[in-house]
From Swiss-Prot:
Residues 36-50, 101-111, 173-190, 270-279, 331-355 are periplasmic. Residues 399-477 form the PTS EIIB type-1 domain. Keywords: Cell inner membrane, Cell membrane, Kinase, Membrane, Phosphoprotein, Phosphotransferase system, Sugar transport, Transferase, Transmembrane, Transmembrane helix, Transport. It comes from Salmonella typhimurium (strain LT2 / SGSC1412 / ATCC 700720). The chain crosses the membrane at residues 15-35, 51-71, 80-100, 112-132, 152-172, 191-211, 249-269, 280-300, 310-330, 356-376. It is a multi-pass membrane protein. One of its GO terms (cellular component) is plasma membrane. This is PTS system glucose-specific EIICB component. Gene3D superfamilies: Glucose permease domain IIB. SUPFAM superfamilies: Glucose permease domain IIB (SSF55604). Its main location: membrane.
C-alpha cells in the first residue's frame, strides 16, 4: 500500500511541475506589466499585464491538463479529456449548488462556495487520467466503433465530471469555507506563523520530492486580490504579480537560496580534506552559483542531506525562519519559479525594502557558514571531500550515460515507469533490490531516495535530458 501511495505521490509532484513551468514567463509578463514602469509605453504594459494575467486566470485548467498528462505518459487525449472534464464539472456546480444551498448564484460566487480553484483543476485532471488509463483500449460494438479506444476517454470523462460536479455541490461548500478561513488566516491574520510553518515543512519534503504538492495552496490559493480591470487573483504568487501590496510573503526563500545555502556550500568546500579540496571546490562553487542565480538548491542539499542529517534539520529550521523575518521586516519581492537572482531582479517592480535583502542575506550567509563549518569539524561529518574513501564519478555526456543509468536502475525490464522533474529522475521499479544506488552516485547523482517502488536520483537540471536519452535507449535496445 505504501509503495503505491509513494509512487502515486511522486507522479502528482511531477505532474504539478508542468503547470509551474509556465509561471516564469507568465510572472514576468504580469509583474513587469503591472509595475507600470515609466520607461515602458502604457500600451506595452497593458498588453503584458493582460497576457500574464490570462495565464494566472486559467491556472485551474492548466493544472487539470498537467495532472492528466503526468499520469498518462503525456498522452494528448488525456489533456483534451481534462479540459472537457473541468468545463463540465464547473458548469454542473454552477447549476446544482444554488439548488443545494438554497442561495442565489451571486451570493454563492461572492462567498466562493462553489469555487474549487486549482484544486478543482487537479480533481478534473485526476478524473481524466483515471478514465484514460481505464478505457483507452475499450472496444465497442461495430456500429459505435468510431467512439472506441481513446475517443471514448473525453466522453466518459465528461460524464464522470457531471457526477463529480453534483457530489462537489454538496461536499465542497464546507471544504471551501474551511479553505477560505485558512486562506484568510495565512494571508492576513497570522502570516508570520503560517509561512514559518510553510518554509520548514517545504524543506522537509524536498528529500521525497513532494514539496511541489505542499507549495500549491500557498502559491496558488491563499488570499484574494482584484485588480483595476476586475480580474481576481488567488495565491501569493499571482497576487504579488498583479500588484497586491499584501502579497509577497514567499520572499524568505531569497535569504537561504541566494545567501544561506551558497555559504553552506563554501563551508563544505573549506571543510574538505586538503587533497580533495580542489575537486570539491569546483562542485560546490558550481552548485552555489546555481542556487544563487536560479534558486535550484538540490545539488547543495543532497550533498549533505544523507551524510549529515543534523545539518539538514538545522537548514530546514533556518529556511522556515527566513519567511517570518522577511514578513516582520516588511521585505517583499516576487518569485515565479524559484528564489534566485533572476527572479529577484526581474520581478522587483512591486517589491518593498529591496535594499534590505543583501544586508539580511549577508547575515544569513554568516550563520549558515558558521553552523556548517563548526558542526562538520566538531562532529566529523562525512560531507563531500571528507569521506574515508572516494570514487571518481563516471559522468559524461547524457547520451553516453543512458545505458549505464538503465543498468543502474536494474535494467529496462526492472523499470516500470520513467519520469523526470527539474532536478531529479523519478523512476518506478519492479524490484528495488536490483537498483545500484552506489552506481547511480558514481554516475553523478547527488543523492538517491528510495521509498516503496519509487526511486529518485538527483542529477540536477540535466535530469530531463537524461530521462529523454534513457527513453530512447530503452526503445531502441
Amino acid at each position: 500500500m505504501f509503495k503505491n501511495a509513494f509512487a502515486n505521490l511522486q507522479k502528482v509532484g511531477k505532474s504539478l511541475m508542468l503547470p509551474v513551468s509556465v509561471l516564469p514567463i507568465a510572472g514576468i509578463l504580469l509583474g513587469v506589466g503591472s509595475a507600470n514602469f515609466s520607461w515602458l509605453p502604457a500600451v506595452v504594459s497593458h498588453v503584458m499585464a493582460e497576457a500574464g494575467g490570462s495565464v494566472f486566470a486559467n491556472m485551474p485548467l492548466i493544472f487539470a491538463i498537467g495532472v492528466a498528462l503526468g499520469f498518462t505518459n503525456n498522452d494528448g487525449v488525456s489533456a483534451l479529456a481534462a479540459v472537457v472534464a473541468y468545463g463540465i464539472m464547473v458548469k454542473t456546480m454552477a447549476v446544482v449548488a444554488p439548488l443545494v444551498l438554497h442561495l442565489p448564484a451571486e451570493e454563492i460566487a461572492a462567498k466562493h462556495l462553489a469555487d474549487t480553484g486549482v484544486l478543482g483543476g487537479i480533481i478534473s485532471g485526476a478524473i481524466a487520467a483515471y478514465m484514460f488509463n481505464r478505457f483507452y483500449r475499450i472496444k465497442l460494438p461495430e456500429y459505435l466503433g468510431f467512439f472506441a479506444g481513446k475517443r471514448f476517454v473525453p466522453i466518459i470523462s465528461g460524464l464522470a465530471a457531471i457526477f463529480t460536479g453534483v457530489v462537489l455541490s454538496f461536499v465542497w461548500p464546507p471544504i471551501g469555507t474551511a479553505i477560505q478561513a485558512f486562506s484568510q488566516w495565512a494571508a492576513y491574520q497570522n502570516p508570520v506563523v503560517a509561512f514559518g510553518i510553510y518554509g520548514f515543512i517545504e524543506r522537509c519534503l524536498v528529500p521525497f520530492g513532494l514539496h511541489h504538492i505542499w507549495n500549491v495552496p500557498f502559491q496558488m490559493q491563499i488570499g484574494e486580490y482584484t485588480n483595476a480591470a476586475g480580474q481576481v487573483f488567488h495565491g501569493d504568487i499571482p497576487r504579488y504579480m498583479a500588484g497586491d501590496p499584501t502579497a509577497g510573503m514567499l520572499s524568505g526563500g531569497f535569504l537561504f537560496k541566494m545567501y544561506g545555502l551558497p555559504a553552506a556550500a563554501i563551508a563544505i568546500w573549506h571543510s574538505a580534506k586538503p587533497e580533495n579540496r580542489a575537486k570539491v571546490g569546483g562542485i560546490m562553487i558550481s552548485a552555489a552559483l546555481t542556487s544563487f542565480l536560479t534558486g535550484i538548491t538540490e545539488p547543495i542539499e543532497f550533498s549533505f542531506m544523507f551524510v549529515a542529517p543534523i545539518l539538514y534539520i538545522i537548514h530546514a529550521i533556518l529556511a522556515g525562519l527566513a519567511f517570518p523575518i522577511c514578513i516582520l521586516l516588511g521585505m517583499r519581492d516576487g518569485t515565479s519559479f524559484s528564489h534566485g537572482l533572476i527572479d529577484f531582479i526581474v520581478l522587483s517592480g512591486n517589491s518593498s525594502k529591496l535594499w534590505l535583502f543583501p544586508i539580511v542575506g549577508a547575515g544569513y550567509a554568516i550563520v549558515y557558514y558558521t553552523v556548517f563549518r563548526v558542526l562538520i569539524k566538531a562532529l566529523d561529518l562525512k560531507t563531500p571531500g571528507r569521506e574515508d574513501t572516494t570514487d571518481d564519478a563516471k559522468a559524461g555526456a547524457t547520451s553516453e550515460m543512458a545505458p549505464a543509468l538503465v543498468a543502474a536502475f536494474g535494467g529496462k525490464e526492472n523499470i516500470t515507469n520513467l519520469d523526470a522533474c527539474i532536478t531529479r529522475l523519478r523512476v518506478s521499479v519492479a524490484d528495488v533490490a536490483k537498483v545500484d544506488q552506489a552506481g547511480l552516485k558514481k554516475l553523478g547523482a547527488a543523492g538517491v531516495v528510495v521509498a516503496g517502488s519509487g526511486v529518485q536520483a538527483i542529477f540536477g537540471t540535466k535530469s530531463d535530458n537524461l530521462k529523454t536519452e534513457m527513453d530512447e535507449y530503452i526503445r531502441n535496445s
